[in-house]
């Protein structure tokens, strides 16, 4: 039981660190973008491939 708690605590701690690093990187990317057109293209890249990839795998 004790080793299970230690393992879960370690996973939670590492996950929290990983999430905070990803969030910092994402914020840095958003700050680097100067033009709103670039931001719109990035949003399209994130949204559109997901449904297209989903339907492509089903056929």
UniProtKB/Swiss-Prot annotation:
Signal peptide bounds: 1-22
Keyword flag Secreted: yes
InterPro entries documented for this protein: Frog_antimicrobial_propeptide
Cellular localization per UniProt: Secreted
Pfam families, sorted: FSAP_sig_propep (PF03032)
Keyword line: Amphibian defense peptide, Antibiotic, Antimicrobial, Cleavage on pair of basic residues, Secreted, Signal
Domain of life: Eukaryota
Main subcellular location of this protein, as a coarse class: secreted
Organs and tissues of expression: Expressed by the skin glands.
Propeptide: 23-44
Any Gene Ontology biological process: defense response to Gram-positive bacterium
GO cellular component annotations of the record: extracellular region
Keyword Signal: yes
Function (record text): Antimicrobial peptide. Has activity against the Gram-positive bacterium S.aureus (MIC=6 uM) and the Gram-negative bacterium E.coli (MIC=3 uM). Lacks hemolytic activity against human erythrocytes.
Family to which this protein belongs: Belongs to the frog skin active peptide (FSAP) family. Brevinin subfamily.
Name of the protein: Dybowskin-1CDYa
Organism of origin: Rana dybowskii (Dybovsky's frog)
């Amino acid at each position: 039981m004790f080793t299970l708690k230690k393992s879960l605590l370690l996973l939670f701690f590492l996950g929290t660190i990983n999430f905070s690093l990803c969030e910092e990187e994402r914020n840095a990317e958003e700050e680097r973008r100067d033009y709103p057109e670039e931001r719109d293209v990035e949003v399209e890249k994130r949204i559109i491939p997901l449904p297209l990839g989903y339907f492509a795998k089903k056929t």
